[in-house]
């Protein structure tokens, strides 16, 4: 018996219908990416919205923004950035995914709740006397 270890083979790339499967995150940044799976694209929209919520929550908390101006600013930026992403950058047909409104509201309330929590935590930690 030899004391050598077995060399593990690197994992093979995943195949989908005989073609190489492209990573979801590599498709996010490519404007010419094809989204065959509707749920995969909606997941990207959902998580992109959560990232925006965290970033804006931190910024709004560090800046002394309060009240309606902060909430309205979040809603406009969150919806606007995602609308520009899927309509102008990706240039997808919104009707394939349920229309513009369906994509605009995908994960919005969850991101709004996350934004509020992050905003309150940072604002309280920095500006509370």
Swiss-Prot record:
Which BP terms in the Gene Ontology apply to this protein? mitochondrial respirasome assembly; multi-pass transmembrane protein insertion into ER membrane
Lumenal-facing ranges: 66, 128-129
Q: Which residues lie on this side of the membrane: Cytoplasmic?
A: 1-44, 85-103
Cellular component terms (Gene Ontology): endoplasmic reticulum membrane; mitochondrial inner membrane; multi-pass translocon complex
Protein location: Endoplasmic reticulum membrane; Mitochondrion inner membrane
Q: Which UniProt keywords apply?
A: Endoplasmic reticulum, Membrane, Mitochondrion, Mitochondrion inner membrane, Transmembrane, Transmembrane helix
Q: What is its main location?
A: endoplasmic reticulum
Instruction: Give the quaternary structure.
Output: Component of the GET- and EMC-like (GEL) complex, composed of RAB5IF/OPTI and TMCO1. The GEL complex is part of the multi-pass translocon (MPT) complex, composed of three subcomplexes, the GEL complex (composed of RAB5IF/OPTI and TMCO1), the BOS complex (composed of NCLN/Nicalin, NOMO1 and TMEM147) and the PAT complex (composed of WDR83OS/Asterix and CCDC47). The MPT complex associates with the SEC61 complex. Interacts with NDUFS3, NDUFA4, NDUFV1, NDUFA9 and NDUFS8 of the mitochondrial membrane respiratory chain NADH dehydrogenase (Complex I).
Its recorded name reads: GEL complex subunit OPTI
Q: What is the lineage of its organism?
A: Eukaryota, Metazoa, Chordata, Craniata, Vertebrata
């Amino acid at each position: 018996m030899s004391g050598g270890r077995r060399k593990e083979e690197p994992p093979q790339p995943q195949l989908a219908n005989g073609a190489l499967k492209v990573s979801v995150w590599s498709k996010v940044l490519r404007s010419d990416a094809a989204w065959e799976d509707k749920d995969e694209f909606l997941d990207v929209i959902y998580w992109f919205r959560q990232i925006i919520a965290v970033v804006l929550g931190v910024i709004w908390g560090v800046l002394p923004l309060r009240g309606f101006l902060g909430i309205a600013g979040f809603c406009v930026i969150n919806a606007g950035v995602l609308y520009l992403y899927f309509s102008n950058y990706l240039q997808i047909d919104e009707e394939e995914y349920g229309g513009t409104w369906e994509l605009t509201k995908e994960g919005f309330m969850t991101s709004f709740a996350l934004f509020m929590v992050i905003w309150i935590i940072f604002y309280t930690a920095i500006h509370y006397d």
